[in-house]
A protein has these predicted regions:
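Non-catalytic, solvent-exposed segments at the cell envelope interface
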Residues: 1-309
Length: 309
């Protein structure tokens, strides 16, 4: 029998157990200090590569009391300075740097501390996967149903994956879904972040559509080698049940982007985004006042006005 993630040292020490335990409906607290916040990381980590970069950086905020959720995406080229014990760099290397300092969980811990310092959002848990892990999760769910507003066409050389999708509803397998969330050919980082948020909702939809809640413990154990997390099985089931009870209008999306929150620039020969952390800290707290998730994850005002990149 496969060992559950609960037995892993990665699961034994939540990033902020005391903080999560003290969550309460206190109107004096900022909204994202009243939520359970999960850092979701997706990297290009491979066995043959000594280092890696993080392509997916999202914060999933769950307000368990009010029945709302928010998804905040951070582009990978956001410049971070300072980074404790390291030179300033893009945010997409911080997971790697943290693991060099403290193997088996130091990366999410370092990134969580930087997010809290710069954005004022406490991180309680993390979920981290690489390319193979992502494909295994999607295939274990039986694929994901995604409706496109605009065509997506790309070839990912490093993974030898070609994708060409028309603006209709598709069922994507793990390999296709990986290309969908990694492609930057249409719309760059901003559109890629929106597609990644759509995949979060597609996972929820697939679990509900196939009535897979009873299979969560088996999936949790089977994905032991593909996904690292500090979320225990009991909490995982609780969070899945919470997600299944959400309606589209209960979920709000926020993608950090230019020109107000991020400004393009160069540092050390790298193309970067310079963040206005003061404005970001203020704006992310308004996430539950923003339009529903799927409205902010469409390209145009409505289907008749879609403007594709």
């Amino acid at each position: 029998e496969a060992a559950p993630l609960e037995s892993s040292p990665l699961e034994s020490a939540p990033l902020a157990p005391a903080a999560e335990a003290s969550l309460q409906a206190d109107d004096d607290l900022p909204p994202l200090s009243r939520t359970t916040n999960i850092l979701v990381l997706g990297s290009d980590r491979r066995p043959r590569m000594p280092n890696w970069r993080t392509d997916v950086i999202m914060i999933v905020a769950m307000d368990l009391a009010s029945g709302q959720a928010g998804v905040i995406s951070i582009p990978r080229d956001v410049y971070i300075s300072p980074i404790p014990n390291h030179q300033p760099n893009r945010i997409n290397v911080i997971d790697y740097l943290g693991e060099q300092d403290e193997p088996d969980g130091g990366g999410p811990k370092l990134l969580a501390s930087i997010i809290e310092e710069n954005m004022g959002i406490p991180i309680h848990h993390y979920l981290r996967f690489d390319f193979e892990g992502f494909k295994e999760v999607v295939d274990a769910l039986g694929g994901l149903e995604i409706t496109l507003d605009c065509p997506v066409s790309d070839y990912l050389l490093g993974e030898d994956i070609a994708i060409r999708l028309d603006p209709v509803t598709h069922r994507l397998d793990g390999k296709q879904a990986l290309a969908y969330v990694r492609s930057r050919r249409q719309g760059g980082d901003l559109e890629r972040s929106r597609r990644q948020q759509r995949v979060i909702w597609a996972v929820r939809d697939q679990i509900q559509r196939e009535n897979m809640i009873s299979k969560v413990p088996a999936l949790y154990a089977a994905l032991h080698d593909s996904v690292q997390t500090d979320i225990g099985l009991v909490s995982a089931i609780r969070y899945v049940r919470f997600a299944l009870a959400l309606q589209e209008e209960d979920v709000h999306g926020f993608v950090l982007g230019p020109p107000d929150l991020l400004t393009s620039g160069w540092r050390g020969g790298m193309s970067i985004f310079v963040a206005d952390w003061e404005l970001i800290t203020e704006q992310v707290q308004t996430i539950f006042d923003r339009p529903p998730f799927m409205e902010t994850n469409t390209v145009g005002e409505n289907s008749a006005q879609t403007r594709c990149p």
